[in-house]
């Protein structure tokens, strides 16, 4: 009887530990998603960035030497018409409902479910985003969207953004999707180069380091070096929207190696964090 009771108790403990582990995995997104979807602090942060964007845009329109694409903007660009480059997801569109779905169903990101989410066309505008883009459009600045949404989602993306009131570019294709052309991979410099052929880029706004610099998938140390080398552009030509839910910051601790298990990925992230030593004994 004692043996049976011990076995039963052991089975219960194992089951509870498995449930706890699943709950812990699922909660990785909880605080970040709660902040972006529900907090006034996030709304204030986004509004602040887009308010600064208006100021920087006006400065850039006056200063003909100004460019937000230093690596791609070459030649006599000063007389070119003006444009800005914006990322879409978590820069202009709030996709936190997808994050919530993943948490509630204990799922991780997959292209299939993400594309289905895009097809639902339920993303909403980030606070301040639509107002800023309309302001830029009123200044005759061409709006280019360089996004790592896949090319097959372009129709749904356009329709979602049109419903919200974002300008679509008229007779110019302003949606530059990932893999729309063979050379348009996840790194965005090749697409920025397309824009700079015909436009002077005044601002670049995104939520991930990769929206600005192709070195985003390097080690944490190399990312920091790249960030430091770009220091003159942050807050001026380059503006960052806060996104704690996902991005290259999240994958850098485990070397962007997506073959690692969820447990290995989480361990790598915990291992790089600096901790207080605790109370003195």
What residue spans do the PLM features occupy?
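Bacterial N-terminal signal peptides that target proteins for export
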Residues: 1-9
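Bacterial N-terminal signal peptides
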Residues: 8-17
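Non-catalytic pre-domain segments flanking phosphatase-related domains
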Residues: 23-86, 258-263, 267-281
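Second-shell loop/turn segments in exported
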Residues: 35-44, 115-123, 144-150, 179-181
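C-terminal cap/substrate-recognition subdomain and adjoining C-terminal extension
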Residues: 40, 51, 150, 154-281
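Surface-exposed patches in mature extracellular/periplasmic domains of secreted proteins
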Residues: 61-73, 143-148, 170-173
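Active-site neighborhood of HAD-like aspartate-dependent phosphohydrolases
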Residues: 81-83, 92-127, 131, 138
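Substrate-recognition element of Asp-dependent hydrolases with the DxDx(T/V) motif
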Residues: 90, 129-162, 209
């Amino acid at each position: 009887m004692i043996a049976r009771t011990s076995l039963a108790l052991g089975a219960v403990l194992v089951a509870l530990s498995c449930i706890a582990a699943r709950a812990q995995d699922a909660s990785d997104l909880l605080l970040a998603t709660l902040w972006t979807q529900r907090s006034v602090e996030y709304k204030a942060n986004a509004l602040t960035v887009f308010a600064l964007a208006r100021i920087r845009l006006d400065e850039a329109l006056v200063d003909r030497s100004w460019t937000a694409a230093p690596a791609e903007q070459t030649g006599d660009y000063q007389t070119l018409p003006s444009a800005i480059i914006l990322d879409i997801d978590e820069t202009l569109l709030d996709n936190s409902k997808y994050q919530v779905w993943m948490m509630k169903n204990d799922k991780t990101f997959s292209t299939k479910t993400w594309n289905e989410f895009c097809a639902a066309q339920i993303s909403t505008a980030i606070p301040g985003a639509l107002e800023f883009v309309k302001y830029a459009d009123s200044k005759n600045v061409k709006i280019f969207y360089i996004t790592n949404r896949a090319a097959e989602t372009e129709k749904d993306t356009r329709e979602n953004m049109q419903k919200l009131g974002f300008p679509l570019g008229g007779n110019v294709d302003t949606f530059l999707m990932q893999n729309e052309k063979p050379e348009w991979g996840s790194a965005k410099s090749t697409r920025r180069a397309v824009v700079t052929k015909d436009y002077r880029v005044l601002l670049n706004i995104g939520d991930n380091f990769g929206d600005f610099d192709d070195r985003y998938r390097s080690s944490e140390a190399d990312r920091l070096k790249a960030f430091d080398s770009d220091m003159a552009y942050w807050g001026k030509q380059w503006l960052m929207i806060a996104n704690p839910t996902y991005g290259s910051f999240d994958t850098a601790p485990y070397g962007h190696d997506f073959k690692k298990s969820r447990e290995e990925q989480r361990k790598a992230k915990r291992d790089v964090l600096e901790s207080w030593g605790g109370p003195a004994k």
